[in-house]
C-alpha cells in the first residue's frame, strides 16, 4: 500500500466508544470520553494524553474499582500524577476518588453525586478547554461524559 492509501486508512479509523474517544463538548470545549474502564495504568496513560493537549485541561474522574488492598494508595497516586503532569483542574465523584482530589490539592473538587459534578463541570466548559472523563464501569462516568457533549438526547443544549 502506498502512503496515500495508508493515510486514507488511518484517517478513517474511529475510536471505540469510551476509549479516548474525542467528542465535541458543550460551549466549544473538547471532550475526551475514556469511560470504558479505569485502572492505574490506563489512568496514567489518559493523564499523559490529556497533559499533551493544548489549552486548559480538566480531568473528571470516578472511582477505579477492584484494586484490592492498595485501592486508596492507587487513587491518591493518581491525584499526584495529574497534578505533576500539569492538569489544571480535577473533578471527582466516588468514595475513593475523593482521595484523588485530596492528593491533587488546589483546583480539585470532590462531589457526592454525579449530578453535582456535572453541574460544576458545565460551569468550566469554554472554547479551548479539554475535559477527559474516566472511571471504572461501576462508576458510570459515561453518564457524565454524555451530559457534557454539545447536544443532549432530546436535542437541547446540554449545558
Region spans (language model):
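ATP-dependent carboxylate-amine ligase
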Residues: 1-159
Amino acid at each position: 500500500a502506498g502512503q496515500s492509501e495508508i493515510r486514507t486508512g488511518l484517517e478513517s479509523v474511529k475510536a471505540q466508544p469510551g476509549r479516548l474517544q474525542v467528542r465535541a463538548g458543550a460551549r466549544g470545549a473538547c471532550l475526551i470520553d475514556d469511560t470504558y474502564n479505569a485502572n492505574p495504568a490506563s489512568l496514567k496513560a489518559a493523564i499523559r494524553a490529556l497533559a499533551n493537549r493544548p489549552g486548559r485541561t480538566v480531568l473528571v474522574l470516578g472511582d477505579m474499582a477492584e484494586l484490592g488492598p492498595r485501592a486508596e494508595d492507587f487513587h491518591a497516586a493518581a491525584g499526584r500524577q495529574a497534578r505533576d503532569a500539569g492538569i489544571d483542574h480535577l473533578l471527582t465523584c466516588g468514595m475513593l476518588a475523593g482521595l484523588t482530589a485530596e492528593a491533587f490539592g488546589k483546583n480539585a473538587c470532590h462531589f457526592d453525586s454525579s449530578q453535582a459534578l456535572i453541574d460544576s463541570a458545565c460551569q468550566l466548559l469554554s472554547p479551548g478547554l479539554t475535559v477527559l472523563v474516566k472511571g471504572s464501569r461501576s462508576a458510570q462516568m459515561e453518564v457524565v461524559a454524555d451530559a457534557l457533549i454539545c447536544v443532549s438526547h432530546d436535542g437541547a443544549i446540554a449545558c
